Structures are given as C-alpha cells and as structure tokens.
A protein has these predicted regions:
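Hydrophobic alpha-helical membrane segments
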Residues: 1-168
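Phosphate-group recognition and catalysis centered on beta-loop-alpha active-site segments
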Residues: 102-109, 120-419
C-alpha cells in the first residue's frame, strides 16, 4: 500500500480536482470502496470457462464474491483488533516493556498479513499446498523481523536525539487544551494560553453574509429550535449572539476581529484556517488580507486552508503572510509555489513527504495528534510540530522524553508504517 501511495504521489493532479476530492473526501472514500468491490464482483462474474483457466475448481461467481468479501472482512477486523489493543496496552506500559509489546504487536501484524496473502493465493488458484507453507514462512519472517528489530533498536539507541524541547512545536487545535472549554472561542483561547502557552493556537474562520469573518468550524449552525442554517447566510451580529455548548461548557461565538485582538493582547501567535464551501466567493481571501494581514504579520500569525485557491489568492494579496496547505491525506503530488508549510493528517504522514517538504524549505505540522505514540511517530519522521487537542499532556511528555522513547518512535515508524 505505501508503494501505491508513493506512485500516486508522483502523478500531477490538477489543483481543482484535488480541491474537489478534499472537499468531498468522505464521499470520495465511499466511491473508492464501492469501486473496489465492483471490480471484485466483475472479476467474480467471468464465465465458467474463464474461471476454469484461473481456478483448479470451478466456483460460482456469487460464492466466490462472498468468500472474497468474508476474507477481506476478517483481515480488516483482526487488523483493527491488533491496532486497538496495541494502542491500549501502550498507555499502560513503561520503558522496555513498551518496546517488547510493540515488537509483539508488529510481529503479529506481519503474520496476519502473510496469512491473508496465502489465503488469497489459495482462493484464487485453489492450491492447498500453501497451507503447509504458512507456518514455515511465518516463522522465517518472524525470525528475520526480530533480528532486524534488535539491530534497529541498537542503532537508534546510540543515535542522537533531536532537541524536542526547542524545535518541536505544539499547536493547540481550535485553541483548546483537553476539555478546557468550547473550541474556537475566546474563553478557551485565554485558558489555553494560561495553562499551556502553545507555540501556536489554531482556529477556523468562515465569511458571513455581510462580508465579515466569524470564528467557527462547521458550515451549519443549529438555532434554538434545532433548525440548521448555513453560516454564510447569517450576519456576524446574528452569529455572535449564539451560545455554543459542548462537553459541559458554554460560550458565545466571536468575530475574528475580537478573537485576533484578544490573541495579540495575550501574545498568542495564531494559525488561522480559512474555511470555504461551494457557495463562497474566492475574493474573500483579498478581503481577509485587507482587514487582518498587517496585524497578523506584525504578531507572527499564519494562515492555512484546505482550498489551494485560497492560499494562492492570499499570497497574491499579501506575499509576506505565511500560508499553509491543509492535506486530509497525502497520496497526490506535492503542489509547489505559494505554500510556506503543510498541515497533514497523521494517518498518512510519512518520512518521504516530510523530507520532500524540507528540501523545499517548508515546514510540516501533523494533525490531529492526541496521544504519545502518534507524537513519537511524528518526531521520528521529522515533523516540525503537532496540532493537538491535548497540548499540556504532550508538552509534559516531550519535556521528559528519553532516548528510549524516541527509539520507540523510530522503530514504530520503520516497521509499522513501512514508509
């Protein structure tokens, strides 16, 4: 799978298509899954004569499809089980026990993958001799894996650990720190500054119907009667009178001007994500820069967006304002030009992407990283920081991180992600 992603990342994809995929990524993933099972069904629907060429026993198309579907389901279930138990146990172990546990889990993942591939061969070609080879091959791979793991651990334990305290950035996702308030609100911003003092505080803004900007993540907002309305069809005055409740906290929405003023008063640098939808006019980037760019530049603030056209238009309006590209997954070619940094989703982060970004003198922040294991992986592959909901927790962890902790991060990245 990593090979496929790397191959796709070399193919230039038009920005308009990337934007469409990112904006509708849930539907895109659903379409990809449906296409996959559609291809499996077509493969299973060939004539009996053709089936006889590929299979030692003729299998009816429906029966074959169901067997393949069952095999895929079993593989996904056991992979998810190992992933879940690995993460759960990691939080309850210390020191070398963490290493031993991760080695065991990764070894089981390898064996599971081998057994899955063997089952595929047997299903496709009807060769039951593979059964007798599964344990033999699994054992050989396990021994090789353990030898490689020991060599890896010895090498990493004797390597230099980067200065995580000074170089690695903690970014408060939506301005929050744990469950300290309603995300994207002024009270939460102040509380996070007091308790965490993050390197940056990240937030989301949308343009209102009267051309102003409000601090909010979702495109829809429910009123007191429960009816949802689009944010870009409401005025700023209407929005700031709306009280938002979440996890036992309540706070009023705020305009971006107020939020920015408070952040500058408490000396909290910001990374502002400019949210858009299909109804927005891309002139909003110029309007945003006209209102806020000078003040943001003076205080070291930055912007990022999942819409590349917004980044381009911001740069056209104000070249000095640093802009980042938000990537929900990294499988396409890396765009060049207006970007100063990348914000990439942690599930698809990999060393090759970060190296390519660093070669272009661009930083990479990973989102949303909320546990120590993912933070270690981000450190190990060279990310410049993490966007997190648990900034205080990760900050304390990084201050006390040992060489063994960093070694575990390198080890997991090398063998778990294979990137």
């Amino acid at each position: 799978m990593p090979f496929i992603f790397r191959a796709l990342s070399q193919i230039p994809i038009p920005i308009a298509i990337q934007n469409a995929i990112f904006d509708h990524r849930r539907q895109f993933i659903l379409i990809v899954v449906c296409c996959f099972f559609g291809m499996v069904w077509l493969f299973c629907s060939v004539s009996d004569e053709t089936v006889g060429v590929f299979f030692s026993k003729k299998i009816k198309s429906k029966r074959l499809f169901l067997r393949i579907l069952l095999l895929e389901t079993e593989f996904i279930f056991w992979s998810a089980f190992l992933f879940a138990i690995g993460y759960w146990m990691y939080g309850h172990l210390l020191g070398n026990a963490q290493f031993l546990w991760e080695i065991l889990i990764l070894m089981l993942k390898w064996i599971l993958l081998i057994m899955y591939q063997m089952a595929c061969f047997q299903l496709y070609f009807g060769n039951r001799s593979f059964d007798s080879r599964v344990s033999e091959i699994s054992g050989s791979v396990t021994i090789c894996f353990l030898i490689a793991a020991v060599v890896q651990l010895i090498f990493v334990k004797n390597s230099l650990v980067p200065n995580l305290q000074s170089d690695f950035k903690i970014v408060a996702h939506r301005g929050s720190d744990g469950n300290n308030g309603v995300p994207n609100t002024v009270p939460t911003l102040k509380d996070s500054k007091k308790k965490l003092s993050p390197d940056y505080s990240e937030l989301d803004v949308r343009q209102t119907v009267d051309g102003r900007f409000v601090v909010i993540h979702d495109a829809m907002l429910a009123n007191s009667s429960g009816k949802e309305r689009e944010v870009n069809n409401l005025s700023l005055g209407d929005l700031i009178e709306h009280k938002v409740k979440e996890s036992g906290h309540a706070a009023y929405l705020s305009g971006y001007s107020q939020y920015l003023e408070v952040a500058h008063q408490i000396k909290q640098p910001l990374i502002t994500e400019i949210k858009t939808d299909e109804h927005d006019n891309y002139d909003l980037a110029a309007e945003f820069c006209h209102l806020y760019a000078d003040s943001m530049i003076d205080h070291g603030d930055m912007v990022h967006s999942m819409d590349y056209r917004i980044i381009v238009n911001v740069k056209k309006s104000e070249k000095r304002l640093k802009c980042g590209y938000v990537l929900p997954f990294e499988i396409f070619s890396m765009p060049k030009g207006a970007i100063d940094f990348y914000s990439i989703e942690y599930l698809t982060m990999n060393r090759s992407f970060i190296k390519a970004a660093h070669d272009q003198k661009k930083k990479v922040y990973v989102w949303t990283v909320n546990n120590k294991l993912d933070c270690l992986r981000a450190c190990a592959i060279g990310a410049d920081g993490v966007i997190t909901d648990n900034g205080s927790k990760l900050k304390r962890f990084l201050k006390t991180a040992t060489k063994d902790d960093f070694s575990l991060g390198c080890f997991i990245n090398s063998y778990a992600t294979l990137k």
